[in-house]
Amino acid sequence: MNYKIAVVGPIPHDTIITHKGNTIVKYGCVTHPTIALSKLLKGRGEVIPISQVNKRDVSPILELFKPYSNINTSGIFSDSDQGTSIELKFLDQNNRVEKQLSNMKPISPKDVEPFLDVDCFVFVPITDFEVKLSTLKFIKENSKAKIIFDAHGPTTFVTDNGKRLRKYWKDKADWLPYIDVLKMNLEESICSHIEEDYTSEELYDENRTDHLEDFAKNVLKHGVEYLYVTLDSRGCAIFSNEDNELKHDFIKSVSVNNVVDTTGCGDSFAGGLSYGFTLYNDYVKAAHYANALGALRTQGKGFDVFKSLEETNNLIEETYS
């Protein structure tokens, strides 16, 4: 069977200063799950990155994807010459300061229309304006594809001077009916549930999880099938409804010894979810692949960190058998 997964969001030109002081320059976000999925789907399916990019970035992006024959690049648009550039400085392994240098033109229904036959759309926006709500509505009305959505976008905004800050996801009730699987990290779950001014507050507290059950009930009430909340190196929490009762699962992480770069871990995790749901329609298997891709992403600066299906399955087997 020829599976098709579309990865939707920005392909930013990233300048990354790691927590160890190293500088990495590369194209990020959509590229991580796209290349990871291309390796998992080799010989069995294709991956379609859908993004708006700067004209100057088209050639290097196409060159980046060129070694992977099952990446369909017809969804990379540059007609508006409006892509994303970002500078990221890591304070420690997980926390960073971000500055946005240019903004992407939002993904519209017109951009996704040629790809309505895919099995899954996985949205990985990193800022609140990058995907239009009308785009999700259009897919729901015209496609049978599963919609996986990363809450990084709607919980992040850009100030006039390019500073990237957290925000409360005020209109989430408008979005949730058009999302099948919602993915976020713990910090984003707080920004999605508790209405506060987050612009100057240190949000991250790995022990602050007491809000999750109430938040999950609200999310699932609006039609979302599964809520995944990543808990960094611990693993991920999954919330769903079973017999009208809230079901809470915890899936431990895939352990790694040396973390080189955590940029793109969330995007890679979302890509793993799309693989598990597309091939197995199994929320636990989806978490296994998500944790595996997120862990692999930390292991180096390049895309060679992602492995073949056989190697990835071996990693999953070692962790979860």
Regions found by a protein language model. Give the residues of each.
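Conserved beta-alpha-beta core of the PfkB/ribokinase-like small-molecule kinase fold
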Residues: P125-E213, N241
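Short, conserved phosphate/pyrophosphate- and ester-handling motifs at nucleotide-, phospho-/glycolipid
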Residues: L37, N185, G266
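Active-site metal-binding loops of divalent metal-dependent hydrolases
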Residues: P10-I11, S268
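Conserved phosphate-binding/catalytic region of the ribokinase-like
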Residues: Y3, Y168, H193-S321
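Short amphipathic alpha-helix
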Residues: T31-A36
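Conserved N-terminal subdomain of the carbohydrate kinase-like
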Residues: N2-I5, H13-I24, K39-P125, F129-E130, ...
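A short, aliphatic-rich alpha-helical micro-motif
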Residues: F115-L116, A173-L176, K221
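Structural motif
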Residues: A6-V8, C120-V122, I148, K183, ...
